[in-house]
């Protein structure tokens, strides 16, 4: 895999932005074998620009204001070319360049000949545009720096890129690139395969952008929130593409095996986040959150524990790998993000539970007196019980029968006393992980709180 940084735009190219790209790629496990920076390949770019110029397919533009492309003329009309510069004789052009006058180098787009520029796109099919409608775009700016068009094409030619895949908003640029490819390589050589992908848009239909939707478009936002990289890749692949069957949750290898350019949709893909988000979860598309939860559930316990343990320790809790291995299967079905471990399993990590409402101890169709009887009997029973799933099951169900209660009425006060909440993992497994000493201590504290 080749990684090429298109860094010729000096204003936008910062160390922070480059490091962010590298961090995101590494998190996604997209390693690379070779690394190129366009800014270090300027000699190649200028060599190809000069070759095009020597073929008579480019000209110097000495107009001071012309440092790039996309200029406008009056009444909102798109600028196409400057006749005075386009028709400047080679001798006059050489004289002015030799005198040190700065110039931009522009491609000499064929005009008045009825020519068409065409290419076949793997997603959007046959694309045709009249050459007369394409401006004489810049190859080199007046400061000598190559434009995006020239640098990208020059590097694609040199590195022998076979497929050029980018956003649909680059379709208009591709006509210019076809002209560059043919001018640099010769008309008889095959073009790369072009494929333009549908755009990712916000719920309001606007294109996603760093300026407006910063966190949503940053890969590191998903990483820091606790997404698994395979889940994020799964989500990205399903934006504008779907397999031929009805699968949604797919591994990396399954995605590789099923993917084809022909399966990409032409319609823009909507990323359904809330704007503005009122909770961290609303920053993300619900489908992405669901996929992440599914990928978490599919992880082997040891792998999940290895991901959760650094998060727990970073939060200041001293937890052993052995204990984390015991906790992970209990919360695997209950978390959507890796960082949810800090709220789903916090009662496993603390010595003292935070305050909770004693009313939570009261079982369904019961009262405070019933809750107190349950906890008192549980303290007696658990003191002599074997702290295994089967041992706790047998002891507590027998105690419920003695008290004339349903199992749920027996279990709820114990669960709240042990975990500080009604919504917690399965009771017996939870008590085993907490251990006899901690369980009895918390039940004792709950009893004192009710008196």
Outline where the language-model segments fall.
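N-terminal Rossmann-like or analogous alpha/beta NTP/dinucleotide-binding catalytic cores
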Residues: 1-79, 83, 173-180, 184-189, ...
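Active-site cores that bind ATP or allylic diphosphates and position pyrophosphate for catalysis
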Residues: 3, 60, 64-196, 201-211, ...
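Glycine- and acidic
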Residues: 3-7, 159-165, 217-218, 395-397, ...
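Catalytic adenosine-cofactor/nucleotide-binding cores of aminoacyl-tRNA synthetases and other
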Residues: 10, 184-187, 193-355, 419-451
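Residue-level signal for inorganic ion chemistry
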Residues: 21, 52, 56, 107, ...
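A generic secondary-structure signal for well-formed alpha-helical elements
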Residues: 25-29, 53-60, 75, 111, ...
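Aromatic-anchored, charged helix-turn/loop surface patch used as a conserved interaction hotspot
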Residues: 325-390, 394
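Helix-rich, typically C-terminal accessory recognition domains appended to large enzymatic cores
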Residues: 388-433, 447
């Amino acid at each position: 895999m080749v990684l090429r940084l298109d860094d010729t735009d000096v204003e936008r190219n910062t160390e922070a932005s480059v490091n962010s790209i590298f961090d995101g790629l590494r998190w996604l496990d997209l390693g690379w074998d070779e690394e190129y920076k366009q800014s270090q390949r300027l000699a190649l770019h200028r060599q190809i620009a000069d070759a095009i110029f020597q073929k008579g397919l480019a000209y110097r533009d000495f107009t001071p204001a012309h440092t790039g492309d996309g200029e406008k003329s009056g009444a909102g009309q798109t600028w196409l070319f400057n006749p005075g510069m386009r028709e400047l004789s080679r001798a006059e052009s050489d004289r002015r360049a030799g005198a040190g006058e700065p110039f931009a180098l522009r491609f000499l787009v064929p005009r008045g000949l009825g020519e068409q520029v065409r290419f076949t796109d793997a997603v959007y099919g046959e694309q045709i545009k009249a050459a007369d409608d394409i401006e004489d775009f810049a190859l080199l700016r007046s400061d000598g720096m190559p434009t995006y068009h020239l640098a990208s094409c020059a590097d694609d030619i040199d590195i022998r890129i076979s497929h050029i895949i980018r956003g649909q908003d680059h379709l208009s640029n591709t006509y210019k690139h076809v002209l560059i490819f043919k001018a640099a390589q010769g008309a008889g050589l095959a073009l790369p395969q072009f494929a333009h992908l549908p755009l990712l848009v916000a719920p309001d239909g606007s294109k996603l952008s760093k300026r407006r939707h910063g966190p949503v478009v940053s890969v590191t936002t998903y990483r820091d929130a606790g997404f698994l990289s395979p889940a994020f890749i799964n989500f990205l692949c399903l934006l504008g593409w779907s397999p031929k069957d009805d699968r949604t949750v797919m591994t990396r290898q399954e995605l590789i095996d099923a993917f084809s350019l022909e399966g990409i949709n032409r319609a823009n893909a909507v990323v359904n986040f809330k704007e503005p988000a009122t909770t961290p979860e609303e920053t993300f598309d619900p489908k992405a959150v669901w996929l992440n939860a599914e990928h978490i559930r599919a992880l082997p316990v040891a792998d999940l524990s290895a991901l959760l343990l650094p998060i727990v320790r970073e939060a200041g809790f001293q937890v052993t790998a052995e204990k984390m291995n015991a906790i992970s299967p209990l919360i695997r079905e209950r978390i959507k993000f890796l960082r949810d471990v800090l709220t789903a399993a916090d009662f496993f990590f603390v010595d003292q539970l935070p305050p909770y409402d004693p009313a939570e101890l009261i079982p369904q169709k019961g009262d405070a007196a019933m809750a107190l009887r349950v906890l008192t009997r549980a303290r007696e029973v658990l003191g002599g019980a074997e702290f295994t799933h089967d041992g706790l099951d047998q002891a507590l169900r027998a105690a419920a029968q003695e008290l004339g209660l349903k199992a749920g009425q027996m279990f709820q006060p114990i669960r709240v006393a042990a975990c500080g909440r009604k919504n917690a993992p399965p009771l017996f497994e939870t008590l085993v992980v907490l251990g006899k000493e901690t369980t009895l201590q918390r039940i004792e504290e709950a009893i004192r709180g009710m008196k």
